[in-house]
Amino acid sequence: MTRPVLVLVHGWGCDSRTWQPVLDGLRELVPVQLVDLPGFGNTPALETFSLPAVLAAIESQLPERCVLLGWSLGAMLAVQLAARLPQQVLGVISLAANARFVASDDYPHAMAPDVNRQFNSRFAEQPQAALKMFTGLLAQGDVQERALLKQLRTQVPDAINHNWAQALQLLAELDNRAALVQLSQPLLHLLAEQDALVPIAAAESLRGLNSQHQIHVIAGSAHAVHWSQPQQLISAVQDFYETLATAVDKKRVAQSFGKAAATYDSVAGLQRAVGAQLLDYLPAQLDRTRLLDIGSGTGFFTAQLATRGAEVIALDIAQGMLDFARQQHPQAADWVCGDAENLPFAQSSVDFIFSSLVIQWCARVPQLMQELARVLKPGGRAYISTLGPGTLVELKRAWQQVDNYVHVNRFVGRTSLEQAVQQAGMQCLAFVESTRRLYFSRLRDLTHELKALGAHNINPGQAQGLTGRQRLQAFSLAYERERSPQGLPASYEVYYLVLCKP
């Protein structure tokens, strides 16, 4: 699958030439497109450098699928674009940028307002002197400050127009907090430890806005990170793209399981057996407690949980599943459509969490565990079953003899799960591994069951379009080599976890 284009959006006081130190390295990794802001570089100035006009100017240049890498003002604009274009902008890398550039009473970890006003006034009166001062701020505090300053002085543009002062005003007014809170795409904040323009204390403020977003602090770097530590930025981009490549498309997950609602119960033997075993870990009576069933599906286990006396909230990402479950079990629970990685519930609001064979579809397990810990009350417990990387290993082996595409979903292993639990501040009271093996007389019976469950391949990297007849025949022959006297095997590596929030 072609990697989405990386669109580079520069900050104030420069143009797209500022990406020179990282450009060759980035182009070795991904397709790259440079953008000049209106009034900067080769882009004509706007009559007014307003937020709607600037976003429209950038949007007109964006490819159909892209990742935005913005620096400073460019990063703040990238966040705004991602919030407006969630289907087009697949992710954002925010370099040396804050939710607000200028501090306010309710957001103190930013530039002091009087400092910002003084600089803007100086630029209006003596633009060249202000630019020289600005270049010094870009390098201030860096471990290689003198060498960095010398490099940056060669980048100061000669031509200045009315958009520059207007851009400073927009920078002072821009508030990205609401956009960051709602942003569902992956976002990486890269902050500079020695930044003279964006205080490092902003890291905690940014973390509080959206727990799903990643934050990394680059040690020893000033504001011009891509000049100070170019290789670290290139490596961060590479890691970000790898995360995108393995992330499960949640919309496709929801559509896949939603379409399977009517057929799910008829073929869900494995799911029933695993869920029943997970139920045995829960207390028999749950009177006067609040329980969250994550990935409630058709409501089969939701109804059983309700008989134990708990107030049950059933959450699923697939509206089709919720509609079906509500019809089958109208009184069993409150039915909520939502994402397990961004739970629509208050902190410390539930006593128990039940989730059977669901979290293997989550793209970011650390964020998931953070969310579970957030909504659990102190002393609350989460009971989880999920699939490990040994799942459908026979299917994987057979396809590997045919092509190099991804045909089996990638599942997280025990070590990564335990690390995510620990990082979320929870304790793992039990971790049980079990292998269940099903047998089918015909290959079409296995593939039919997977499709009826909605559990066919939804990972990026799979083959696009129809699978050719020759490839299907080769796959069928390869799978036949797995046949035993009981039939064609399909193995499932099942994990059972009992977690506790201290």
Curated annotation (Swiss-Prot):
Keywords: Biotin biosynthesis, Hydrolase, Methyltransferase, Multifunctional enzyme, S-adenosyl-L-methionine, Transferase. Its EC number is 3.1.1.1, 2.1.1.197. GO terms for biological process: biotin biosynthetic process; methylation. Pathway: Cofactor biosynthesis; biotin biosynthesis. The keyword Hydrolase applies. InterPro entries: AB_hydrolase_1, AB_hydrolase_fold, AB_hydrolase_sf, BioC, Methyltransf_11, SAM-dependent_MTases_sf. It catalyses: a carboxylic ester + H2O = an alcohol + a carboxylate + H(+); malonyl-[ACP] + S-adenosyl-L-methionine = malonyl-[ACP] methyl ester + S-adenosyl-L-homocysteine. CDD domains: AdoMet_MTases. Pfam families: Abhydrolase_1, Methyltransf_11. Substrate binds at residues 12, 134-138, 223. Residues 225-502 are annotated as: Malonyl-ACP O-methyltransferase. The keyword ATP-binding does not apply. Residues 1-224 are annotated as: Carboxylesterase. One of its GO terms (molecular function) is malonyl-CoA methyltransferase activity. The active site is at 72 (nucleophile), 195, 223. GO terms for cellular component: membrane. In the N-terminal section; belongs to the AB hydrolase superfamily. Carboxylesterase BioH family. Converts the free carboxyl group of a malonyl-thioester to its methyl ester by transfer of a methyl group from S-adenosyl-L-methionine (SAM). It allows to synthesize pimeloyl-ACP via the fatty acid synthetic pathway. The physiological role of BioH is to remove the methyl group introduced by BioC when the pimeloyl moiety is complete. It allows to synthesize pimeloyl-ACP via the fatty acid synthetic pathway through the hydrolysis of the ester bonds of pimeloyl-ACP esters. This is Biotin biosynthesis bifunctional protein BioHC. It comes from Cellvibrio japonicus (strain Ueda107). The gene is bioC.
